[in-house]
UniProtKB/Swiss-Prot annotation:
Subunit structure, interactors included: Monomer.
Origin species: Methanosarcina mazei (strain ATCC BAA-159 / DSM 3647 / Goe1 / Go1 / JCM 11833 / OCM 88) (Methanosarcina frisia)
Protein role: Catalyzes the attachment of isoleucine to tRNA(Ile). As IleRS can inadvertently accommodate and process structurally similar amino acids such as valine, to avoid such errors it has two additional distinct tRNA(Ile)-dependent editing activities. One activity is designated as 'pretransfer' editing and involves the hydrolysis of activated Val-AMP. The other activity is designated 'posttransfer' editing and involves deacylation of mischarged Val-tRNA(Ile).
Lineage top rank: taxon: Archaea
Motif ('KMSKS' region): 596-600
Protein name listed in UniProt: Isoleucine--tRNA ligase
Cited SUPFAM superfamilies: Anticodon-binding domain of a subclass of class I aminoacyl-tRNA synthetases, Nucleotidylyl transferase, ValRS/IleRS/LeuRS editing domain
Length: 1058
């Protein structure tokens, strides 16, 4: 049977209880098995790094996923939903280095690669377990015992297989290129891994002396002085105009400079020149005949072996000088220009960011620390035109936050540029939510994509499966572990991580020995193969053929250049199509002011702290309802508290009828809604219709992943329609006899609505839904599904839908609100009855609504009658005051104006308005008996209310409240005041609903006493008093005695338990 619940919503206790129930009943496994015959849905979880505690962003991400997957499950989808874990790469290595106190790769080498690998593995596995428990605490249901983990050999093989496909399709390339490089981690990093932030760097203008011309210089600008020792060329734009001009200083010294014509003034200003003379102008293409000297040739001997020239490039812009310093070893554009013209790829910098011996006098110095040294050397050689600083957005390593540099190194690349057009076609074949996530943001990223550098010079990652012969240099790509064991002639098993796999050699046809190249995969390549790796492909095709590609994925908008992109690229290589059918892109979590959360700002909020304070369901409901999924979430604690209050209201809504239902032994299995259909009131039919409308709205919202609209719809319905309206309407019906059909109808309707709402909230607030389901449904129907999450999603019952009734109730509620506003103006509280409400409807629909819901209106306005005027008609008891306009009267009547104004004020307003309408004028008799004619512009009109009434506007039209009191109304008003206070005292004594009491009331005001005595029986019935003593000299006693001030009348009341 239905049981009472606690008065207070206790999230911690409920969630502990429900978690235990789920574990004891094996609810997740059974729920998934329950849907095995349903339509398949393949979901791929974007794997978080196993680096520690979950944060608000990862919590929001998993809550979005869980809510959508629960919704799909209830719609009979059989879901493959393995959680994923990214367990390799710099994110893990940097954490382990921190634990071990390491500062560089040298420390790792000294420690031992094998030891380091084992530490990384141990760390990743330990953190995975901790994070699993944290996600489970959020109420997230996934196949937690069977996750996919990137460190497993079966997963590694999926990456190997994909690379072999690239090799076979001629999409794999090895070569020297200038790449993003982290000097602390000593590895290449991808474009998508570069994080940009504000940084102040040197800003210098440098003079390169032109060979064969006296005192003539090309002027370049750079923010990286440390790259000057690697300069090999200058780039200019072929179509820009350049000038050779004499620049003169105040002391009379002069130099001949070359720069873009448009930028001469900037160069003069930077160099503090006072005058200039243009000697010659030419297009950029005419400068290519020039050669120049390195400004640091005496310090960097290798510079003297290079022929420095001017080359054309479209990437040059009209900024600073229009001449760009080119160092192919330290920039992608520079490298490409150098490769085009076969320029030397000078890169005198090592992997740790320090100059090599090739840098001459700078050897051994860290490049960033060398900036001021280079500047001083340029100054000493009179090659520094100007120096300053610039604050700009500069790239940093995504994991250790070290400023990146560009280094020309040998790397492995996927030739994305060769499949880019097909990738763009596949983007159009995917359903994107919102649409612009694919059609704009993602498309733009892919259009600008370069070949993907997939190699990293690190340790803890998937080893690149390329074996190279030491003797002949032949390369071989291995696709699986079995293939490697066979070619190596090994029996048994090996682990596919470094350094174990590095020990495996493969014989070469030339008689030499092939060893694995040392690089590991870019960690984004790990997760790129998730959709087939999680299906255990290529070991077996069974699951792959049944499930692939993914039906749905969702991640943050940063993944347009991360996981969305890497998956698409790898899948195009492996299968020639996108690995997903639909993608939901969500936003970032920010603080309330819109700033990124960071420890340095002290604005980080832990989801676990929020759960500890408010519970998981509150956090879930908040992040889901706060904004559209693709908008950034500005986390606001006050809004969390508001949602928590809403859930408390939801709890109280559920709790409200339970004591009465339990007391009456109400059994919804015995009393159906059909059996009480004839006893249904209009408000019952309305709430049934509203519940169906909510189901429809939530379904529509979920079809477009508008989770915020879905959750808001449910909470608004609970708060506005159930709590603030329907429950207020039916409250008196719950106090009647147990077998009263009217009461049973209210019970059945509430039960029906509660069952619907319990199912609707289950994807979003799974703990609360389960708690209510077990009490409301499982307790009365043992044949019902074991968990709410096994239930089918509610379908719209068209038989209950009545949109006309919903519109009518909206009208009625507007009238009630207007009546309440009018009561306040009249100073009459709602507890006090009034004789009538008058409504002047502005439409036939409004009039019909009033007639249809007359009893609801009378009840909710506490009025004895509802009076309707005709549609568009004014209330006939209204007066119409005439307000003369002296400004219009004065010019016409001049001296007589003083007589006209008071005479006009006395005229009947209705008669005057009628005359104006019919004749366009009115003959006014003045005090002296003379008459004048007045016209419409001379008078304004103002409605006046009868004495004791007040009005307010509603959607239906004006509403008037007659607040005049009769003795009968006053008696009822005082009686209601007494009832309210006695009920408060019952609550204070914590009495059960049906417990009878003895009441004593003393009222010394004889007039009020007589009024209250007339309704003694009503008061006794309402407060369940079988003994009720009232009088001016009554001895008030009992278990609780209180003095009250009731509308200025002193009263003493006592309650005694029976």
């Amino acid at each position: 049977m239905i049981k009472e619940i606690t008065a207070k919503y206790d999230a911690e206790q409920i969630e502990k209880k429900v978690t235990q129930f789920w574990e004891d009943s094996d609810a997740y496994r059974k729920t998934r098995e329950h849907r095995k015959s349903g339509k398949r849905l393949f979901f791929v979880d974007g794997p978080p790094y196993t680096t520690g505690h979950i944060h608000l962003g990862t919590a929001w991400n998993k809550i979005i996923k869980d809510s959508i997957l629960r919704y799909y499950s209830m719609n009979n989808r059989y879901i493959l939903e393995r959680p994923g874990w990214d367990m390799h790469g710099l994110p893990i290595e940097v954490k382990v280095e921190g634990v071990l106190g390491f500062k560089s790769k040298k420390d790792i080498e000294s420690f031992g690669v094998e030891n380091f690998i084992e530490k990384c593995k141990e760390f990743a596995i330990k953190q995975k377990q901790a994070m699993t428990e944290q996600f489970q605490r959020l109420g997230v249901w996934l196949q937690w015992p069977d996750p996919y983990m990137t460190l497993k050999d079966e997963y590694i093989e999926a990456a190997w297989w994909t690379l072999k496909q690239a090799s076979e399709k001629d999409l794999l390339e090895v070569g020297k290129r200038s790449v993003n490089w982290c000097p602390r981690c000593e590895t290449a990093i991808a474009d998508s891994e570069v994080e940009y932030s504000e940084r102040t760097d040197p800003s210098i203008y440098v003079k390169f002396r032109v060979k064969g011309e006296e005192n003539t210089f090309i002027v370049i600008w750079t923010t990286t002085p440390w790259t000057i020792p690697a300069n090999v060329a200058v780039a200019v734009h072929p179509a820009y105009e350049y000038s050779k001009f004499r620049a003169i200083r105040q002391d009379g010294s002069e130099e001949i400079l070359i720069a873009a014509t448009e930028l001469i003034k900037n160069v003069l200003k930077q160099g503090r020149y006072t005058d200039f003379e243009v000697l010659e102008t030419m297009l950029g293409e005419e400068l290519t005949k020039l050669e120049y000297e390195s400004p640091v040739g005496d310090l960097v001997p290798v510079q003297n072996e290079i022929k420095h020239g001017v080359y054309l490039a479209d990437f040059v812009t009209v900024e600073n000088t229009g001449c760009v310093h080119i160092a192919p070893g330290h920039g992608m554009d520079d490298f490409n220009l150098g490769a085009k013209h076969k320029l030397p790829i000078l890169c005198p910098v090592g992997s740790n960011g320090s100059y090599t011996e090739e840098a001459g006098e700078y050897a051994g110095k860290n490049v960033k620390e060398a900036n001021p040294i280079v500047i001083e050397d340029l100054k000493a050689r009179n090659r520094l035109l100007a120096e300053g600083t610039v604050t700009h957005r500069y790239g940093h390593c995504w994991r250790c936050k070290t400023p990146i540099i560009y280094l020309a190194t040998e790397q492995w690349f996927l030739k994305v540029t060769e499949i880019k057009e097909k990738m763009l076609e596949e983007i159009d074949a995917v359903d994107w939510y919102p649409d612009w996530a694919g059609s704009a943001r993602f498309r733009t990223w892919v259009e600008g994509a370069r070949d993907w550098c997939i190699s990293r010079q690190r340790y803890w990652g998937i080893p690149i499966p390329v074996w190279k012969c030491k003797k002949c240099g032949k390369l071989e790509v291995i696709g699986t572990k079995a293939e490697l064991l066979e070619k190596a002639g090994l029996n048994g098993d090996i682990e596919l991580h470094r350094p174990y796999v590095d020990r495996v050699t493969v014989p070469c046809e030339c008689g030499g020995e092939k060893k694995r190249v040392e690089d590991v995969f870019d960690v984004w390549f790990d997760s790129a193969v998730a959709s087939w790796a999680t299906l255990k492909f290529p070991q077996t095709r069974d699951q792959f053929d049944e499930w692939w590609p993914a039906d749905f994925i969702t991640e943050g908008h940063d993944q347009t250049r991360g996981w969305f992109y890497s998956q698409l690229g790898a899948s195009m290589v492996g299968f020639g199509r996108a690995p997903y059918k639909s993608v939901l892109m969500h936003g970032f979590t920010l603080d309330a002011g819109g700033k990124k959360m960071s420890k340095s700002l002290g604005n980080v909020i832990s989801p676990l702290d929020i759960i500890g304070r408010f519970g998981a369901d509150t956090l879930r409901a908040y992040v889901l309802s706060s904004s559209a999924p693709w908008d950034d979430l500005k986390f606001n604690l006050e809004e969390v508290e508001t949602i928590h209050r809403s859930i408390n209201i939801l709890w109280n809504v559920f709790r409200f009828p339970l004591p009465y239902m339990a007391l009456d032994n109400f059994d919804p299995m015995q009393v159906s809604l059909d059996s009480v259909r004839d006893a249904l009131r209009e408000e019952d039919r309305w709430i049934l219709s509203r519940a169906q409308s909510v189901v429809k709205s939530v379904d529509e919202a979920m079809s477009g992943y508008l989770l915020h609209k879905a959750v808001r719809e449910i909470l608004d319905f609970t708060l506005e329609d159930l709590s603030r309206w329907y429950i207020q309407l039916i409250r008196p019906r719950t106090w009647t006899e147990a077998d009263d059909p009217d009461k049973l109808a209210a019970y059945c309707v509430l039960y029906e609505v509660y069952v619907t709402i319990t199912k609707l909230i289950s994807p979003f607030m799974p703990y609360l839904a389960e708690e209510m389901y077990q009490n409301l449904i499982r307790n009365v129907d043992p044949k019902a599904p074991e968990s709410v999450h096994m239930c089918d999603w509610p379908k719209v019952n068209e038989a209950y839908l009545d949109t006309k009734l919903e519109e009518a109730m909206n009208t009625a509620r507007s009238i009630v609100e207007a009546a309440s506003n009018a009561r306040q103006k009249a100073g009459r509280k709602l507890r006090w009855p009034i004789s009538r409400i008058v409504v002047s409807p502005e439409s036939e629909d409004a009039a019909r609504a009033v007639e249809r819901l007359r009893s609801v209106l009378m009840d909710q306005t506490n009025s004895k009658d509802i009076v309707l005027t005709g549609v568009g008609k004014s209330w006939d008891e209204l007066g119409l005051e005439v307000i003369p306009d002296p400004g219009k009267i004065g010019p016409v009547f001049k001296r007589d104006a003083g007589k006209v104004v008071p005479a006009l004020q006395k005229v009947d307003g209705f008669a005057l308005k009628k005359a104006f309408a019919e004749a366009g004028e009115f003959e006014l008799t003045l005090a002296d008996g003379s008459t004048v004619k007045v016209t419409p512009e001379m008078a304004n009109f103002k409605e006046t209310l009868p004495e004791g009434t007040a009005s307010a506007e509603s959607d239906a039209g004006p509403v008037y409240v007659d607040a005049n009191l009769t003795p009968e109304l006053e008696a009822e008003g005082y009686a209601r005041e007494v009832i309210r206070r006695l009920q408060d005292m019952r609550k204070e004594l914590d009495l059960v609903v049906d417990e009878n009491i003895q009441v004593s009331v003393r009222i010394e005001d004889e007039r009020v006493l007589k009024l209250v005595e007339t309704l003694k029986g009503l008061i006794a019935e309402e407060v369940r008093a079988d003994v009720f003593d009232i009088g001016s000299g009554v001895n008030v006693s009992g278990d609780l005695v209180k003095d009250w001030d009731v509308e200025g009348i002193a009263m003493k009341m006592g309650i005694a338990k029976k």
